[in-house]
Amino acid sequence: MTQSLVISIDAMGGDHGPSVVVPAAARAARDLPHVRFLLHGDEAAVRAEVARCAGLAERTEVRHADRVIGMDEKPAQALRRGKGTSMWGAVEAIREGDAHVAVSAGNTGALMAISKLILRMSADLDRPALVASIPHAKGVTTFLDVGANVDCDAERLVEFAIMGEAYHRAAHGVAKPTVGLLNVGSEEMKGHEEVREANRILREGGFDLEYRGFVEGDDLTKGSVDVVVTDGFTGNVALKAMEGAARFMYGELRAALTAGPFSSLGALLARPSLLRFRERMSPPPAAPLLGLNGLVLKCHGGAGDREFAKAIRAAADVAQSGFASEIERNMRRLPAALSPAAPSPADGAA
């Protein structure tokens, strides 16, 4: 982009607040010369951090927020007291046209509720979904929902498939992404009622999707399909299990390579490769909330400045991807696919 891109950031969100968020903005700014920042939070604290980062002040506007939404607040509480908080300000800047995309490391449920209230849903969608990018040998798998919606009926899963396919097409340049529905087996009769009904709708609904049916957990890292769809409960558990496994493997590998003098010498020689391995296995820096009339990304609450800088770079990429129009085009087919006149599930599917 030749014109300036504005990223609105909740500077108080997450476990560390401005002491991490502001240096992260400075780190990301070095790679994003066309980006400006709106930082929302306690003005004195944020400005003090900005002053420590050379060159950041010229590209940053600080907007004062009196309050912060706690990481343990319920979404209903966050909505009641949201105005005047740093998270509210970061999202509201999108609606007001002051920024192109918002980033927060704050409370996930609160961010979803506030974003939905302020920005509203697009194209008759019901709920936003959090999406993650899972690395595999051939590229990445787009995985959703990873925590925004614990309970999902068949219609929600179909919406997620449409959103995920459009996102993968725009974000990763794949002309016709393949889509799979996460299940406990690939057979048609497997799984609970909601996932079987979603499978039927996706097969018979006339969507412009390359739908491949059910996939299993190991398909996430095999690259069997481009997009894997599930409910937020299952997705969040799977994502965190993969993150934990990656940390365990890296720790064990590092311990084995430093167990003795000769292996330590080998570890020193292998250090660049080990760092690349750790980078490759690191969890995604941020998860976009898909389906809103505006772009919002959720960063890990415990992210350090390096991880938050990655989230900011991801926000810049998403803001330039243009996937919203792809979602809207396929959503027009959804009401007909959900019609009672549509064929019923095959007999014996249990």
Swiss-Prot record:
<comment type="subunit">
    <text>Homodimer. Probably interacts with PlsY.</text>
</comment>
<dbReference type="GO" id="GO:0043811">
    <property type="term" value="F:phosphate:acyl-[acyl carrier protein] acyltransferase activity"/>
</dbReference>
<dbReference type="GO" id="GO:0005737">
    <property type="term" value="C:cytoplasm"/>
</dbReference>
<keyword id="KW-1208">Phospholipid metabolism</keyword>
<protein>
    <recommendedName>
        <fullName>Phosphate acyltransferase</fullName>
        <ecNumber>2.3.1.274</ecNumber>
    </recommendedName>
</protein>
<dbReference type="Pfam" id="PF02504">
    <property type="entry name" value="FA_synthesis"/>
</dbReference>
<dbReference type="GO" id="GO:0006633">
    <property type="term" value="P:fatty acid biosynthetic process"/>
</dbReference>
<keyword id="KW-0808">Transferase</keyword>
<dbReference type="InterPro" id="IPR003664">
    <property type="entry name" value="FA_synthesis"/>
</dbReference>
<dbReference type="GO" id="GO:0008654">
    <property type="term" value="P:phospholipid biosynthetic process"/>
</dbReference>
<comment type="pathway">
    <text>Lipid metabolism; phospholipid metabolism.</text>
</comment>
<keyword id="KW-0594">Phospholipid biosynthesis</keyword>
<keyword id="KW-0963">Cytoplasm</keyword>
<dbReference type="InterPro" id="IPR012281">
    <property type="entry name" value="Phospholipid_synth_PlsX-like"/>
</dbReference>
<keyword id="KW-0444">Lipid biosynthesis</keyword>
<comment type="similarity">
    <text>Belongs to the PlsX family.</text>
</comment>
<comment type="function">
    <text>Catalyzes the reversible formation of acyl-phosphate (acyl-PO(4)) from acyl-[acyl-carrier-protein] (acyl-ACP). This enzyme utilizes acyl-ACP as fatty acyl donor, but not acyl-CoA.</text>
</comment>
<keyword id="KW-0443">Lipid metabolism</keyword>
